[in-house]
Amino acid sequence: MLQPKRTKFRKQQKGRNRGLAQSGNTVSFGDYGLKATTRGRLTARQIEAARRAINRHVKRGGKVWIRVFPDVPVTNKPLEVRQGKGKGNVEYWVAKVQPGTVLYEMEGVTEELAREAFRLAAAKLPVQTTFEYRKVM
């Protein structure tokens, strides 16, 4: 599971996820990419489940890049505990995703194989996505 090795602070405030992706919005490493079209939070488990779906479909061919990293801690209080007494414990980590963020990239496979692998991966994610090509300058 993805999570930071160490952080400056253990817990974070929730914040707001507004605007469009200013960086990480182009296919830079591979030939094809899976780009988010809606905003949301991807948990480390969802990122891993989608990665497994991609790798299972492409088998040994091709290389896959994960372009998002869950670096935001989400806290939760235990069940049946009254409010107060401080913030809850960190339960899981999320990556905040904005429209335009490239989530995964792939190279070394045919377009049909990449499309199908990304379709399987998109079913595991809570955001809507689209298939992207690398822009040749």
Swiss-Prot record:
GO terms for molecular function: rRNA binding; structural constituent of ribosome; tRNA binding. One of its GO terms (biological process) is translation. CDD domains: Ribosomal_L16_L10e. Transmembrane segments: none annotated. The gene is rplP. Binds 23S rRNA and is also seen to make contacts with the A and possibly P site tRNAs. It comes from the Bacteria. It comes from Dichelobacter nodosus (strain VCS1703A). GO terms for cellular component: cytosolic large ribosomal subunit. Pfam families: Ribosomal_L16. PANTHER family: 50S/60S RIBOSOMAL PROTEIN L16, LARGE RIBOSOMAL SUBUNIT PROTEIN UL16M. Belongs to the universal ribosomal protein uL16 family. Residues 1-17 have a biased composition (Basic residues). Part of the 50S ribosomal subunit. The keyword Ribosomal protein applies. This is Large ribosomal subunit protein uL16. NCBIfam families: rplP_bact (TIGR01164). SUPFAM superfamilies: Ribosomal protein L16p/L10e. Residues 1-24 are annotated as: Disordered.
